[in-house]
Amino acid sequence: MKKKIVPINPLKADEILAVSHLSCVFNSKTNNPIKVIDDFSYTFQKNQIYCIIGDSGSGKSTLVNHFNGLIKPNQGDIWVKDIYIGAKQRKIKNFKKLRKTISIVFQFPEYQLFKDTVEKDIMFGPVALGQSKYDARQKAAYYLEMMGLKYPFLERNPFELSGGQKRRVAIAGILAIEPEILIFDEPTAGLDPEGEREMMQLIKTAKQQQRTVFMITHQMENVLEVADVVLVLAKGKLVKAASPYEVFMDQTFLEKTTIVLPPVIQVIKDLIAINAHFNKLIELQPKNLEQLASAINKTIANHG
């Protein structure tokens, strides 16, 4: 049998994930194939927050589901650290290692709970991936408290908790695996404003802990708040990859999209239209309304 040749790993020391010419077609063997990902290529740096945006059906969730092997590519290559995922593979080697490296927090993760205690639910992933029950139990307590729930919750039945508490338990279970890459798919769906703020803080904390984070979202104010890089998808194609300000201030590009600007950016554009001195705000790059107010005061003070 002819041995299949694995491509050379292209990743450099500061890179964690590379995608080369990835394509995905659903219903490929029918008369109505649907191309969901169209020749996507990008190399992702370590310890960055990447926000993936685009219209519904643009391929965002399908893309990230390739990263941890949930969907097999029809064409192209993916490297997650030293783990290779390719279209010609029958199965992924080191699949358990891949699961330890990259985890997805799906939309409404609370619906994934199934054990009779919170502790067992959080322990499930780490134990399944080879950790001892002792270590998993310690991590269950640690990550549950990180999510704002105290030790007594470990013995509670997850189905007796509120919706917000269930979501915290589900996320604690994923954090307990301690993956290097975290993917959040619409993490603020169904949350109140306080819950949104807590989720954004969790994502910032993940970066502070040297993790690489992906976030799929339609909430542009959250993109501005946390993203290092924004990737814009349209009909399965990568049409732009840049910083939030480079994306949101590119009027020529925006005119071709349905992106709704975050309030901070809209205010900046309105102020620039009144007085060119406010172009200074683009350099200061405020990420939220509080920072914007401070930046406006600073700009006014400097220009009288």
From Swiss-Prot:
Belongs to the ABC transporter superfamily. Energy-coupling factor EcfA family. SMART domains: AAA (SM00382). It is a peripheral membrane protein. ATP binds at residues 54-61. ATP-binding (A) component of a common energy-coupling factor (ECF) ABC-transporter complex. Unlike classic ABC transporters this ECF transporter provides the energy necessary to transport a number of different substrates. NCBIfam families: ECF_ATPase_2, PRK13631.1. Its EC number is 7.-.-.-. Forms a stable energy-coupling factor (ECF) transporter complex composed of 2 membrane-embedded substrate-binding proteins (S component), 2 ATP-binding proteins (A component) and 2 transmembrane proteins (T component). InterPro entries: AAA+_ATPase, ABC_transporter-like_ATP-bd, ABC_transporter-like_CS, ABC_transpr_CbiO/EcfA_su, ECF_ABC_transporter_ATP-bd, EcfA2, P-loop_NTPase. It comes from Mycoplasma genitalium (strain ATCC 33530 / DSM 19775 / NCTC 10195 / G37) (Mycoplasmoides genitalium). The lineage of its organism: Bacteria, Bacillati, Mycoplasmatota, Mycoplasmoidales, Mycoplasmoidaceae. Its main location: membrane. Residues 11-260 form the ABC transporter domain. This is Energy-coupling factor transporter ATP-binding protein EcfA2. Coiled coil: none annotated. One of its GO terms (molecular function) is ATP hydrolysis activity. GO terms for cellular component: ATP-binding cassette (ABC) transporter complex. Keywords: ATP-binding, Cell membrane, Membrane, Nucleotide-binding, Translocase, Transport. The keyword Cell cycle does not apply. SUPFAM superfamilies: P-loop containing nucleoside triphosphate hydrolases (SSF52540).
